[in-house]
A protein has these predicted regions:
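Gly-Asp-aromatic-enriched flexible segments
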Residues: 1-176
């Protein structure tokens, strides 16, 4: 993953929610949209090491798909397994899965430079909104993607992502 132009990241577009007595933001938010058909979605949001963030991911229920098969928002889980014939196809693709130990279509956040830190978000089977708290251990741009198969051949890296449909909106709240 390549970082977005650094000049765009110098001042993320945080919207102030409240200020302390010195006029410093206490809570600020930033948003970004993402598509699950992209190998990686840069957000242009720069995270700071050690700062606490709360994030929410919203996507319309039943809006994600993989080659025509419906996928739960946030990926499959033991509570929401794929239908049996889709499970067979996904089983054949496990050796190509981007993150072998994570479920298919699990949302992954990556920050830092190339090969940075990753956080995997667990879906809520009752709600299409996913929430989590993070505290990065390094500075860097926030990227978001889903866990699907990849091919290590130039031009084909995103082959299995191309048939995915849907996306969502990430809202990140910075807490001072």
């Amino acid at each position: 993953m390549e970082s977005t132009d650094a000049k765009k990241l110098e001042k993320p577009e945080w919207s102030d929610k409240a200020k302390d007595k010195d006029g410093q933001p206490i809570i600020a938010t930033a948003t970004a949209s993402f598509e699950i058909s992209k190998l990686c979605n840069p957000t242009k949001i720069l995270l700071e090491k050690g700062v606490r963030y709360h994030l929410e991911i919203d996507a319309p229920p039943n809006s994600w798909s993989d080659g025509g098969f419906q996928v739960p928002v946030g990926g499959f889980s033991a509570n929401q397994p794929p239908i049996w014939y889709h499970r067979i196809l996904l089983g054949l693709g496990v050796p190509l899965r981007r993150e072998l130990t994570q479920d298919w279509f699990r949302i992954v956040l990556r920050y830092g430079r190339v090969g940075g830190e990753e956080v995997f978000l667990d879906p809520d089977p009752e709600d299409s909104k996913i929430e989590a708290n993070i505290r990065p251990t390094r500075d860097g741009e926030l990227f978001i993607f889903v866990n699907d198969a990849v091919i290590g051949v130039p031009g084909l890296y995103d082959f299995f992502y191309r048939n995915n449909g849907g996306g969502g909106k990430l809202t990140l709240t910075r807490k001072y």
